[in-house]
């Protein structure tokens, strides 16, 4: 940096002066020709200064309505009225970014012209940044430039937009795109305005203050760090808000806090003024004030207006600092200081901040999206992105923004990291410096805080965990913290054991160490309101809490021990976990404390650290079994001695701690983290290279320091270790040795690293082989690590699960895991490792990823390493020379809901192929095999029973007796792995009930459900299972059935992604319909209508459902109405969905509606809401409604878990307070577009205008941001909106007891209304053919039109040829469509513009569909064939799953035979026999059709009968067939239907029962299909093609059958 850096504008250094005009004490700076004056309560001063220095005929004050309400206008009027001759005009604006527009600018200019204002006018911009930018631009352009002054009223405007002369308005394409540089004459910074700000707005401005200090002035930054409480107190504290109106107006009345605040504002303005003076037009140096803005603006572009500018810049500063760390080596300590400083002012420092995570829009923030937005940045040079890079606090790498490649930005921003194989890259010996020890750092912080005096901590770990600890200790006022040596040294001013309760909750994130230690420290707290002798008698409360995972981690033994010693601690939610309320009683009693130490040594350390401040000496006895992690206890004792307290070990597990105080050393060196050191050392081991870690040797306090000697050396590594250094050289790649067995109880945190090495340790170790308890010479069993189940995640299960993704088998045991090594060449590529938000999982798996062949291994949740080694990825990709790159660039930058914190079990993904195998799991006797066999038949798949596969290989009882249950489960897992690999498509696989008892099997199922196909939990009522097993001969469990069921139930949920209820015979049918969602084509976005079911049980609707659902595409199941309190049980809902699936094939819209949204579920019942709604996803419902009013993290999770379910994101304004034209409605729409596949907004109509406003809204968003939208108004006045709504309109039916919402209409009523409004013009439909006099087609279609309220007419047009009359009808403007029958099915094609592939291959068209271009009005005629579809439908309805690969017989070779042959081919028949009375015609037709149809002509039906066909289709007149010779031309053999079940179809229209159907009636396993059924089925297809609506089938059938039979009776 040149001499420019660090300086401020010269006037910054001038002393303040008392204004001769107003008496106010003023600080003045200069920015170019602009005077910047700072002070308190300056309105009178402003008026007098302007009158004196800028005389004018008129002064125009432009402000917003919010400031007007706060009295701003009155203050200025009073000030100007006190000056004779001053003319003040006022213009008020609506607040908010929406005002910063062309329209508002024009309105101001029109107003100014109307008031005859001239060029001498002075404009006063009083407000925030919006006012300043807008009014400045008005001043820049009105009459080619007016004088104006800035009077910023927000901190952000004071230090940012008001200084520098930038003015602008927004454009739909972006912010500030139209503007000018126009310098104000004055900037009046009146800090008194800040008293009117909410705290969030104050913090918003502090982001810019911190920014200027970070890039320019280290001294200012230190001031912001150390004086945050005073700075905030100047305007945020209660005392400040109660000050007199003149407080601070003069230096004599100014408090120290006010002076400090003004000083930091002045410092920030001084920096910007200095930079602007040098570089007014932003050619280089002025870029620096954009630190944090390159990334911050991209974040803001997505999250505005919900997240403020300063909040986005705060996150941007941290991310850009991380980029500087990666590109130019910015020390982590600088980033840690920046993060802590931002947090001091309540600013977000990560996108995972709760305020950001609460927004659904955050899922739009992807790496690709941010990079795309960053492309448009004024700092950029063409395609090169420019970012301001810090070199340290107070300085930048260059005096301008620096060029940074996209790849570097991606590595920092991306939510995942791709780690590529690196064994081929040679490396010289490396020295890697690891961060300070987390364990030592956290203990040192507590010890220094509890000590009296000052202690300097060096090499402290700068990470999330230590930040949490420091924040907690500061919040409890146990210590004050400051930085020295440019942040390399933390200065701790301890309070000697004095701890005060905090009014705010102490948030401990997922920092387990901090949670345990701070719980003990909180027991020393006194109430902050107590003083003197009363302190012991008054009590505050310390509220300790954390994130979702922290609330699952145990703390019960510590709480029990502290309670036994007088502490008053209450659990707030569940027992044994945070949150806790600790009553501030001042001290522990002392004496004997018994503590269970078999779960975590941190409990012991927590008591030890605080014990000296008990009222008496403490004797700590460790009870309850083997003590876990004794080295960490020894570390605590050794560190306590360094701080002046000697702990006496009076027995093996009994310690005596004296009542005393800590005496801090002046300096304490934190040694490097031994657990973190295992990763670079392991990389040396696995890649055959050399790595040295200094500051870690035999003299370390940490147990993990022995990792190199006790793990790596026996595995074949060369290890050199002295007291202060460790060097490891690995063997040749692939030559690591397995250890057989190893106890890692003394270094539990290192077991994951060891497991990675054991995964590829294929060489057995002779020294350990004899003592191995493993079954494999190349496996290693790790013991002594049971406590790792309750760390950041269940690490044992996580390692087993994630290793399986790489093809490595591992098995869980009670006290550890066994890892079976795999050759490096056999590791699976393309794995995606989920890290469970656990830093050690991420770093350890990145070690193993170094040797995985292929394109790379993806490490998800890469930011979790920030807990202990924030720069790990920089080190891995830098000094360690491992090829890495950002991954998942199109995924959200933050995972809003990690799987380890999900509210419920998994759901299906979008990755399944349509033929993906289906895996069934569930309790013994749940019906897996029965349902599976039936399902396999329905879906034409192969059924596999895993238990049968096992029993074919082994005698199960003998196997268990000889090898034990562990070996049985291991072999079961091996067989499962084989089945899932070899039978991944085209199968239904039923598994044994206990398969989920094995962690390895659960990992295999998890991988299968995530990537291959659905795993379905078959649920059956427990009483039925119990009853069945009580009378079965299956072997007993050896424990109560209820206990087995209770243990397995959560494991079934965890292992499956769907669940289905075995309700009886139709369970397979219901499941087949359920599986259409994950395995079929996604349902359409825009069906026309859905019917809302309002019954307490779906069974109650069965009698009317077919009638009530006429014309609807979807059924809505109102789950909240299934119980009187709106909260039905999961079991009840599961059963109701299954029953509905059995009864209807219509798609389901699954809705849980809250009270405030017009339903029955209580609004506060969030847990019930999310559990019930998630069930809809697991039940495979095609559409699921999610309410936008529910907590964002929960609905975001549902949206992410949707699979192929369509999400309807809904909002219902039941109170009528939301206006369609209000910005809030647009924001709801935008949010719904982000979360859902369909947006649903429901308003409340009181007048006709409300519906007109809705239509304006619909039109506007369709033009600006088109998205599938349901937009309707409730009540009768809103029925217009229901009439014109284009998709998924909710409807009722007269047969329903009540409408689901006020104003609902029926399908029939809506169509009538649409016709009257001209939205549904009348169309004419025809039947072309001859003879057609007796055709039922007009009755079919006209009945449908009438039932659904359609205005159309269907008529016969009989003609012998396709003549001019036919052409005239099909070309008419009101032509709606036509049916075509003999003899025109071929000749009609000459009039058509297109013919479907089906109709082409059949060679016949029976349906004409007009396609209209709504823009040009042009109509194209399209030909279809629905005959074959009707045959397929009716065979599928009755075949019971037999037709796949079956034999089919088609009788007759006439015109309709081709459709029948095509239908048989589409059904999958492996052999199609074709018989015709004239054999030659059958031969000719067989030769004409494609050879892949496999059509074989036969000359005898007797021969056909021997082939045992499963499907028979007759295409000859009924009178042409009989059972006896001479009766007709074709004799049907009596054994023609000799196969075991099938479907016989007679295409003949009359009589109703033909000889073939008579034959079917004589065979109970055969189903006969009448010609009238085929006519109806093909007509139903035609109706949907013409209208887009489902026909009212049942009502049509009733009408048509009656007419058909009446006509037959009259013949």
Curated annotation (Swiss-Prot):
Q: Where does ATP bind?
A: 922-929
What keywords is this UniProt entry annotated with? Amino-acid biosynthesis, Aromatic amino acid biosynthesis, ATP-binding, Cytoplasm, Kinase, Lyase, Metal-binding, Multifunctional enzyme, NADP, Nucleotide-binding, Oxidoreductase, Transferase, Zinc
Please share the entry's free-text remark on the cofactor. Binds 2 Zn(2+) ions per subunit.
Q: Which cofactor does it need?
A: Zn(2+)
Q: Please verify whether the record's keywords include Metal-binding.
A: yes
What's a single GO BP term from this record? aromatic amino acid family biosynthetic process
- Residues bound to NAD(+) are 64-66, 97-100, 128-130, 133, 153-154, 175, 193-196, 204
Region (EPSP synthase) location: 419-882
GO CC, alphabetical: cytoplasm
3-dehydroquinase: annotated segments: 1093-1309
Q: Residues that bind Zn(2+), according to the entry?
A: 208, 293, 309
Q: Which InterPro entries match?
A: Aldolase_TIM, Aminoacid_DH-like_N_sf, DHQ_synth_AroB, DHQS/DOIS_N, DHQS_C, DHquinase_I, Enolpyruvate_Tfrase_dom, Enolpyruvate_Tfrase_sf
- What is its subcellular localisation? Cytoplasm
> Which reaction(s) does its UniProt entry say it catalyses?
7-phospho-2-dehydro-3-deoxy-D-arabino-heptonate = 3-dehydroquinate + phosphate; 3-dehydroquinate = 3-dehydroshikimate + H2O; shikimate + NADP(+) = 3-dehydroshikimate + NADPH + H(+); shikimate + ATP = 3-phosphoshikimate + ADP + H(+)
Q: Where is this region: 3-dehydroquinate synthase?
A: 1-406
Enumerate the GO terms in the molecular function aspect.
Answer: 3-dehydroquinate dehydratase activity; 3-dehydroquinate synthase activity; 3-phosphoshikimate 1-carboxyvinyltransferase activity; ATP binding; metal ion binding; shikimate 3-dehydrogenase (NADP+) activity; shikimate kinase activity
Which parts of the sequence are annotated with region: Shikimate kinase?
A: 915-1092
Q: In which pathway does it act?
A: Metabolic intermediate biosynthesis; chorismate biosynthesis; chorismate from D-erythrose 4-phosphate and phosphoenolpyruvate: step 2/7; Metabolic intermediate biosynthesis; chorismate biosynthesis; chorismate from D-erythrose 4-phosphate and phosphoenolpyruvate: step 3/7; Metabolic intermediate biosynthesis; chorismate biosynthesis; chorismate from D-erythrose 4-phosphate and phosphoenolpyruvate: step 4/7; Metabolic intermediate biosynthesis; chorismate biosynthesis; chorismate from D-erythrose 4-phosphate and phosphoenolpyruvate: step 5/7
Superkingdom to which the source organism belongs: Eukaryota
Q: Which CDD domains match?
A: DHQase_I (cd00502), DHQS (cd08195), EPSP_synthase (cd01556), NAD_bind_Shikimate_DH (cd01065), SK (cd00464)
Positions of the UniProt region annotated as Shikimate dehydrogenase: 1322-1611
Positions of 7-phospho-2-dehydro-3-deoxy-D-arabino-heptonate binding: 144, 160, 166, 176, 208-211, 272, 286-290, 293, 309, 378
Family in the record: In the N-terminal section; belongs to the sugar phosphate cyclases superfamily. Dehydroquinate synthase family. In the 2nd section; belongs to the EPSP synthase family.
What is the protein's quaternary organization?
Answer: Homodimer.
Question: Its function?
Answer: The AROM polypeptide catalyzes 5 consecutive enzymatic reactions in prechorismate polyaromatic amino acid biosynthesis.
- The protein's name is Pentafunctional AROM polypeptide
Q: From what organism does this protein derive? A: Malassezia globosa (strain ATCC MYA-4612 / CBS 7966)
């Amino acid at each position: 940096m040149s001499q420019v850096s660090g300086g401020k504008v010269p006037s910054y250094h001038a002393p303040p002066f008392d204004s001769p005009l107003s008496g106010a004490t003023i600080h003045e700076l200069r920015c170019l020709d602009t005077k910047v004056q700072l002070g308190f309560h300056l309105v009178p001063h402003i008026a007098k200064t302007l009158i004196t220095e800028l005389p004018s005929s008129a002064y125009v004050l432009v402000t917003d309505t919010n400031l007007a309400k706060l009295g701003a206008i009155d203050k200025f009027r009073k000030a100007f009225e006190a000056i004779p001759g001053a003319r003040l005009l006022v213009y008020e604006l609506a607040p908010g970014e929406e005002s910063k527009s062309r329209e508002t600018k024009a309105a101001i200019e029109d107003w100014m012209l109307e008031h005859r204002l001239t060029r001498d006018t002075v404009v006063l911009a009083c407000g925030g940044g919006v006012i300043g930018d807008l009014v400045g631009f008005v001043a820049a352009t009105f009459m080619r430039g007016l004088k104006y002054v800035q009077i910023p009223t927000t901190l952000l405007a004071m230090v940012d937009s008001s200084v520098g002369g930038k003015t602008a308005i927004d454009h739909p394409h972006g912010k500030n795109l139209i503007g000018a540089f126009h310098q104000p004459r004055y900037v009046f910074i009146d800090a008194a305005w800040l008293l009117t700000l909410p705290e969030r707005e104050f913090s918003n401005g502090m982001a810019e203050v911190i920014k200027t200090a970070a890039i320019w002035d280290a001294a200012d930054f230190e001031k912001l760090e150390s004086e945050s409480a005073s700075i905030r107190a100047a305007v945020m504290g209660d005392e400040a808000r109660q000050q007199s109106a003149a407080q601070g107006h003069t230096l004599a009345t100014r408090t120290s806090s006010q002076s400090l605040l003004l000083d930091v504002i002045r410092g920030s303005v001084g920096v910007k003024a200095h930079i602007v003076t040098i570089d007014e037009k932003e050619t280089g140096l002025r870029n620096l004030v954009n630190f944090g803005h390159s990334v911050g603006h991209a974040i803001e572009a997505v999250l505005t207006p919900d997240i403020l500018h300063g909040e986005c810049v705060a996150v941007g500063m941290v991310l850009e600092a991380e980029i500087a760390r990666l590109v130019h080596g910015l020390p982590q300590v600088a980033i840690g200081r920046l993060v802590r400083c931002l947090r001091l002012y309540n600013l977000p420092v990560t996108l995972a901040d709760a305020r950001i995570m609460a927004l659904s829009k955050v899922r739009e923030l992807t790496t690709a999206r941010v990079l795309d937005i960053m492309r448009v940045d004024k700092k950029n040079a063409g395609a090169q992105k420019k970012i301001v890079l810090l070199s340290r606090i107070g300085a930048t790498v260059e005096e301008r923004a620096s060029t940074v490649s996209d790849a570097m930005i991606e590595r920092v921003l991306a939510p995942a990291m791709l780690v590529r194989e690196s064994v081929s890259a040679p490396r010289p010996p490396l020295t890697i410096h690891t961060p300070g020890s987390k364990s030592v750092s956290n203990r040192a912080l507590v010890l220094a805080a509890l000590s009296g005096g000052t202690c300097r901590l060096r090499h402290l770990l700068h990470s999330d965990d230590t930040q949490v600890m420091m924040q907690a200790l500061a919040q409890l006022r146990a210590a004050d913290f400051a930085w020295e040596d440019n942040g390399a040294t933390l200065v701790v001013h301890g309070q000697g054991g004095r701890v005060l309760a905090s009014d705010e909750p102490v948030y401990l994130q997922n920092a387990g160490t901090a949670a345990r230690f701070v719980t003990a420290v909180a027991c020393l707290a006194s109430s902050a309101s107590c003083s003197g002798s009363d302190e012991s008698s008054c009590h505050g409360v310390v509220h300790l809490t954390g994130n979702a995972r922290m609330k699952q981690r145990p703390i019960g033994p510590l709480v029990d021990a502290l309670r036994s010693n007088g502490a008053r601690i209450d659990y707030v939610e569940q027992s044994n976990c945070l949150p806790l309320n600790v009553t501030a009683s001042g001290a522990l009693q002392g004496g004997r404390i018994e503590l269970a130490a078999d779960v975590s040594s941190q409990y012991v350390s927590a008591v030890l650290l605080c014990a000296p401040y008990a009222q008496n000496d403490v004797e700590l006895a460790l009870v309850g079994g083997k003590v876990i992690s004794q080295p960490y206890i020894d570390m605590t004792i050794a560190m306590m001695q360094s701080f002046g307290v000697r702990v006496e070990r009076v027995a093996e597990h009994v310690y005596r701690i004296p009542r005393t105080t800590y005496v801090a050393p002046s300096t304490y060196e934190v040694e490097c983290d031994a657990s973190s050191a295992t990763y670079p050392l392991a990389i040396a081991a696995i890649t055959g290279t050399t790595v040295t870690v200094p500051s870690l040797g035999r003299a370390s306090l940490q147990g993990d320091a022995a990792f190199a000697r006790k793990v790596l050396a026996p595995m074949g590594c060369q290890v050199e270790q002295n007291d202060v250094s460790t060097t490891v050289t690995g063997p040749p790649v692939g030559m690591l040795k397995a250890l057989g067995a190893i106890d890692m109880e003394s270094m539990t945190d290192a077991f994951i690293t060891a497991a990675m090495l054991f995964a590829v340790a294929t060489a057995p170790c002779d020294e350990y082989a004899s003592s191995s308890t493993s079954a494999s010479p190349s496996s290693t069993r790790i013991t002594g690590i049971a406590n790792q189940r309750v760390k950041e995640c269940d690490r044992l299960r996580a390692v087993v699960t994630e290793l399986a993704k790489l093809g490595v088998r591992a098995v869980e045991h009670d006290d550890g895991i066994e890892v079976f090594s795999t050759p490096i060449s056999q590791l699976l590529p393309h794995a995606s490792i989920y890290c469970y938000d656990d830093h050690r999982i991420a770093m350890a798996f990145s070690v193993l990823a170094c040797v995985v062949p292929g394109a790379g291994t993806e490490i998800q949740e890469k930011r979790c390493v920030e807990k202990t080694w924030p720069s790990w990825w920089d080190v891995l990709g830098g000094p360690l020379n491992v090829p890495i790159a950002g991954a998942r660039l199109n995924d959200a930058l933050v995972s809003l809901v990690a799987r380890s914190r999900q509210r419920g079990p998994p759901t299906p993904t979008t990755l399944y192929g349509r033929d993906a195998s289906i895996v069934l799991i569930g309790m013994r006797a749940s019906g897996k095999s029965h349902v599976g066999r039936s399902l396999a038949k329905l879906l034409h798949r192969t059924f596999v029973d895993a238990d049968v596969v096992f029993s074919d290989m082994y005698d199960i009882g003998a196997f268990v007796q000889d090898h034990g249950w562990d070996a049985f489960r291991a072999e079961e897992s091996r067989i499962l792995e084989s089945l899932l690999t070899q039978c991944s498509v085209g199968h239904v696989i039923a598994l044994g009930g206990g398969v989920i008892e094995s962690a390895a099997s659960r990992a295999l199922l998890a991988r299968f459900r995530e990537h291959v196909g659905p795993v379905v939990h078959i649920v059956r009522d427990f009483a039925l299972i119990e009853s069945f097993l009580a009378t079965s001969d299956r072997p007993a469990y050896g424990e109560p059935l209820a206990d087995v069921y209770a243990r397995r139930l959560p494991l079934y949920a965890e292992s499956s992604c769907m669940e289905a209820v075995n309700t009886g015979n139709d369970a397979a049918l219901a499941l087949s319909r359920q599986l259409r969602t994950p395995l079929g084509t996604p349902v359409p976005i825009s069906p026309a209508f859905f019917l809302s079911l309002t019954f307490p049980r779906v069974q109650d609707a069965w009698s009317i459902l077919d009638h009530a659902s006429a014309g609807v595409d979807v059924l809505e199941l109102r789950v909240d109405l299934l119980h009187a309190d709106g909260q039905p049980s999961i079991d009840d809902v599961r059963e109701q969905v299954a029953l509905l699936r059995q009864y209807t094939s219509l798609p389901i819209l699954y809705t849980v509606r809250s009270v405030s949204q017009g339903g029955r579920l209580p609004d506060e019942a969030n847990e019930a809401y999310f559990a019930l709604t998630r069930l809809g996803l697991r039940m495979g419902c095609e559409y699921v409604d999610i309410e936008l009013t529910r907590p964002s993290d929960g609905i975001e999770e549902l949206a992410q878990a949707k699979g192929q379910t369509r999400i309807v994101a809904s909002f219902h304004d039941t109170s009528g307070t939301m206006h369609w034209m209000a910005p809030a409605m647009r924001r709801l729409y935008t949010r719904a577009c982000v979360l859902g596949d369909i947006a649903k907004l429901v308003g409340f109509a009181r007048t006709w205008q409300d519906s007109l406003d809705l239509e304006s809204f619909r039109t506007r968003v369709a033009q600006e941001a088109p998205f599938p939208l349901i937009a309707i108004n409730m009540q009768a006045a809103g029925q217009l909106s229901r009439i014109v709504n284009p998709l998924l309109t909710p409807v009722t039916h007269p047969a329903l007891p009540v409408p689901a919402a006020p104003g609902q209409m029926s399908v029939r009523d809506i169509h009538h209304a649409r016709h009257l409004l001209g939205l549904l013009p009348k169309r004419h439909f025809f039947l072309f053919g001859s003879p057609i006099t007796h055709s039922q087609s007009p009755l079919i279609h006209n009945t449908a039109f009438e039932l659904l309220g359609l205005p159309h007419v269907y008529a016969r047009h009989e003609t012998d040829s396709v003549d001019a009359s036919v052409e005239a009808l099909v070309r008419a403007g009101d032509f709606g469509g036509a049916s075509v029958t003999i003899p025109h099915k071929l000749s009609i094609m000459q009039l058509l513009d297109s013919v479907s592939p089906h109709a082409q291959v059949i060679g016949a068209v029976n349906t004409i569909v007009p396609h209209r271009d709504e823009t040009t009005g042009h109509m194209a005629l399209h030909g279809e064939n629905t005959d074959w579809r009707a045959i397929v439908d009716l065979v599928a309805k009755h075949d019971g799953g037999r037709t796949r690969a079956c034999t089919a017989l088609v009788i007759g070779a006439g015109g309709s035979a081709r459709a029948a042959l095509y239908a048989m081919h589409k059904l999958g028949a492996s052999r199609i026999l074709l018989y015709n009375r004239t054999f030659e015609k059958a031969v000719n037709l067989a030769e004409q059709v494609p050879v892949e149809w496999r059509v074989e002509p036969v000359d005898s039906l007797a021969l056909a009968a021997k082939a045992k066909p499963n499907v028979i289709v007759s295409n000859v007149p009924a009178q042409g067939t009989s059972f006896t010779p001479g009766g007709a031309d074709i004799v049907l053999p009596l054994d023609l239907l000799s196969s075991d079940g099938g479907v016989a179809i007679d295409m003949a229209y009359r009589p109703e029962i033909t000889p073939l159907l008579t034959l079917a009636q004589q065979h109970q396993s055969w189903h006969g299909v009448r010609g009238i059924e085929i006519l109806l089925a093909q007509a139903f297809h035609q109706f949907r093609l013409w209208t887009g609506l489902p026909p009212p089938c049942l009502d049509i059938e009733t009408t048509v059958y009656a007419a058909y039979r009446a006509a037959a009776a009259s013949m």
